[in-house]
């Protein structure tokens, strides 16, 4: 029978000092011997997705202690990608994922916690905590802060739904008046919560449901809705049930590495493809798989992208649906139900929402709105927006008049009526990206599935933005932004501003964009990121010259630089002749701090999840 990890610091005469310190935190004599459950919170006043999390740890703690555990809360950092966007702050976003993972590991291992609840929400926080949870391999439940309500405003007497990207595009569009731009800006982000579309934060919170590590509704229930309170309480109860199963019954199926198995990663990727999730999710799933010692790779993603249809289309890929609409249609469980009926889901995998001996099949039987007989579950998925600006959680209890169970023309479709029979993400490969690259096909217009254009090369995002706004980029160009990968940036910046500016200048369907950086979940258009190897690692993207012909064929999963092998070999020799300046941008002026340099020294390219190069850390 596994011994409580916390016994290391609570048992024996030699631990008198540790027990004295535990007592100073509120632990009583009769508490010693109970499991200690760490609560990793990520409250901050910097981030709308986290501004309401201050008291959530107390909710979880109450449920844990009621179930017989000792709850101890700590906090991690949280970077807002939207606020960090468009300036040097974005260099810190992806590296913060590693810091979050490390900080959770440090706190849990330093204090010998027995289990973990992760309270996350936004872009790098959920994946960072996920990496830590799989690294630690102790019982864990994830519960997020939830998505914000979609913005709404009237323009030309027409009520429209909005999100963050709409505000950015409008501000960059000279045809939009100052008055309308300001109106959109003030309406785009009305409440606390993660941004309202299928951006990175919401994508990752949905994927934790499919991995089996969070409760139904985690990815889609609005931050403002009163029903979300129960998710926090149930997370506390569930983690205690998992803790007892492992430590008292020697049930290893309660551990995250046994829950998040290869099959579970396939389920998560199937969901991601079906819902057209953010391309960043590929980066984070690959990173999490490495922490779990699961051999899930880009090849698996490529294979699945050809098999899984696009069943759910959400902003930024459409203005019609946001996360509140996904929830009304049954949330993640609704999409998983359709994947199951299409024969594209493993249902024999464990899930934290299942009782001992149960699995995803039993969870779907209860929570898939198309098969459940539970009226409470149907009411749960009818939770809707109030339309009242607020930063407070659980501040409203509005309901939709009905569920969206239209699987022909609704927000979630059956396979027969899918938005497309191929999914919302694709892996492209060719001589421009030997190890692959990623495109969010859910955001690509059908007219752009194949594209041939001339390279317009920039060695930084800043230069690309200046070029787009300055009129250098014209229809037919393929904008190439390089040296923005994990090592070359460093930090693998998001390219939301370049894609937004292309869109605002009417070039959204007339140009393509290729980068070894990454894209915000808010990106749409023919935007191809994660080019691997990156420029700083000797990738072919570093050898592209202005005017080179680039051929993109999404149906064939191909991306080609139409330059002969002999010419590429000659360019590579010229690059190597630079000596210490090889594979570095010559014209870019950028301050890189010591913290970022330390990150860059160990960073791998995107096809490896941009994680640390373990070979450099081994003895």
UniProtKB/Swiss-Prot annotation:
Pfam families (UniProt xref): ILV_EDD_C, ILVD_EDD_N
Cofactor(s) the protein requires to work = [2Fe-2S] cluster; Mg(2+)
Modification N6-carboxylysine occurs at? 124
Instruction: Please state what class of enzyme this protein is.
Output: lyase
Pathway assignment reads:
Amino-acid biosynthesis; L-isoleucine biosynthesis; L-isoleucine from 2-oxobutanoate: step 3/4; Amino-acid biosynthesis; L-valine biosynthesis; L-valine from pyruvate: step 3/4
Q: Where, in this chain's numbering, is Mg(2+) bound? A: 81, 123-124, 494
What Enzyme Commission number(s) does the record list for this chain? Answer: 4.2.1.9
**What is written in the cofactor note of this entry?**
Binds 1 [2Fe-2S] cluster per subunit. This cluster acts as a Lewis acid cofactor.
Q: Supply the NCBIfam families for this chain.
A: ilvD (TIGR00110), PRK12448.1 (NF009103)
Q: What is this protein called?
A: Dihydroxy-acid dehydratase
Q: How does it assemble?
A: Homodimer.
Q: Does the keyword Magnesium apply?
A: yes
Query: For this chain's UniProt record, which GO biological process terms are given?
Result: isoleucine biosynthetic process; L-valine biosynthetic process
Database matches in PANTHER family:
D-XYLONATE DEHYDRATASE, D-XYLONATE DEHYDRATASE YAGF-RELATED
Q: Where along the chain is [2Fe-2S] cluster bound?
A: 122, 195
> Main role?
Functions in the biosynthesis of branched-chain amino acids. Catalyzes the dehydration of (2R,3R)-2,3-dihydroxy-3-methylpentanoate (2,3-dihydroxy-3-methylvalerate) into 2-oxo-3-methylpentanoate (2-oxo-3-methylvalerate) and of (2R)-2,3-dihydroxy-3-methylbutanoate (2,3-dihydroxyisovalerate) into 2-oxo-3-methylbutanoate (2-oxoisovalerate), the penultimate precursor to L-isoleucine and L-valine, respectively.
- Catalytic residues at 520 (proton acceptor)
Q: Which UniProt keywords apply?
A: 2Fe-2S, Amino-acid biosynthesis, Branched-chain amino acid biosynthesis, Iron, Iron-sulfur, Lyase, Magnesium, Metal-binding
Organism domain of life: Bacteria
GO CC terms: cytosol
**In which family does this protein belong, per the annotation?**
Belongs to the IlvD/Edd family.
Q: Which reaction does it catalyse?
A: (2R)-2,3-dihydroxy-3-methylbutanoate = 3-methyl-2-oxobutanoate + H2O; (2R,3R)-2,3-dihydroxy-3-methylpentanoate = (S)-3-methyl-2-oxopentanoate + H2O
């Amino acid at each position: 029978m596994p011994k409580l990890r916390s016994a290391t610091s609570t048992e024996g005469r030699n631990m008198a000092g540790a027990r004295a310190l535990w007592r100073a935190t509120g632990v009583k004599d009769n508490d010693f011997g109970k499991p200690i459950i760490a609560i990793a919170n990520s409250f901050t006043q910097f981030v709308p997705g986290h501004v309401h999390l201050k008291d959530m740890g107390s909710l979880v703690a109450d449920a844990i202690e009621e179930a017989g555990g000792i709850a101890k809360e700590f906090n991690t950092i949280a970077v807002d990608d939207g606020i960090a966007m468009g300036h040097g702050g974005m260099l810190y976003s992806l590296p913060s994922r590693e810091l979050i993972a490390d900080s959770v590991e440090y706190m849990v291992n330093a204090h010998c916690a027995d289990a973990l609840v992760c309270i996350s929400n936004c872009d790098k926080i959920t994946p960072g905590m996920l990496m830590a949870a799989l690294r630690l391999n102790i019982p864990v439940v994830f519960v997020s802060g939830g998505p914000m309500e979609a913005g709404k405003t009237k323009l030309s007497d027409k009520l429209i739904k909005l999100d963050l990207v709409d505000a950015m595009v409008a501000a960059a569009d000279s045809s939009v008046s100052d008055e309308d731009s300001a109106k959109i800006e003030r309406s785009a982000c009305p409440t606390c919560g993660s941004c309202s579309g299928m951006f990175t934060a919401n994508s990752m919170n949905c994927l934790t449901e499919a991995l089996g590590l969070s409760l139904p509704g985690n990815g889609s229930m609005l931050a403002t809705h009163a029903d979300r309170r129960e998710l926090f309480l149930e997370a506390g109860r569930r983690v205690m049930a998992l803790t007892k199963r492992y430590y008292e019954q020697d049930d290893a199926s309660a551990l995250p590495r046994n829950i998040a198995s290869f099959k579970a990663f396939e389920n998560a990727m199937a969901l991601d493809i079906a819902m057209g999730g953010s391309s960043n999710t590929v980066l984070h799933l690959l990173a999490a798989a490495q922490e779990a010692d699961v051999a899930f790779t880009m090849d698996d993603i490529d294979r699945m992208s050809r098999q899984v249809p696009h069943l759910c289309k959400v902003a930024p890929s459409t203005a019609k649906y946001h996360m509140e609409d996904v929830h009304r249609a049954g949330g993640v469980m609704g999409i998983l139900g359709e994947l199951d009926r299409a024969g594209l889901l493993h249902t024999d995998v464990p899930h934290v929402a299942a009782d001992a001996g149960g699995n995803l099949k039993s969870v779907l039987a209860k929570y898939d709105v198309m098969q459940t007989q539970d009226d409470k579950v149907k009411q749960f998925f009818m939770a809707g927006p109030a339309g009242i600006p607020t930063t407070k959680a659980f501040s409203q209890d509005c309901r939709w008049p009905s569920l969206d169970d239209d699987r022909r023309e609704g927000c979630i479709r059956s396979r027969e009526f899918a938005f497309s029979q191929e999914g919302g993400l694709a892996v492209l490969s060719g001589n421009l990206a030997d190890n692959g690259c990623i495109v969010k096909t859910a955001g690509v217009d059908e007219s752009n599935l194949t594209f041939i254009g001339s390279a317009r090369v920039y060695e930084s995002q800043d230069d690309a933005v200046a070029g787009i706004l300055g009129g250098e980029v014209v229809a037919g160009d393929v904008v190439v932004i390089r040296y923005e990968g994990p090592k070359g940036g460093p930090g693998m910046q998001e390219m939301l501003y370049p894609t937004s500016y292309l869109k605002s200048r009417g070039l959204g369907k007339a140009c393509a964009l290729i980068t070894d950086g990454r894209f915000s979940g808010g990106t749409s258009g023919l935007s191809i990121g994660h080019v691997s190897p990156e420029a700083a690692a000797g990738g072919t993207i570093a050898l592209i010259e202005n005017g080179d012909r680039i051929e993109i064929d999404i149906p064939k999963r191909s991306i080609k630089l139409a330059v002969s092998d002999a010419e590429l070999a000659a360019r590579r020799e010229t690059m190597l002749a630079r000596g210490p300046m090889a594979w570095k941008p010559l014209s870019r002026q950028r301050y890189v701090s010591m913290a970022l340099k330390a990150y860059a020294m160990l960073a791998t390219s995107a096809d490896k999840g941009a994680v640390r190069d373990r070979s450099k850390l081994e003895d």
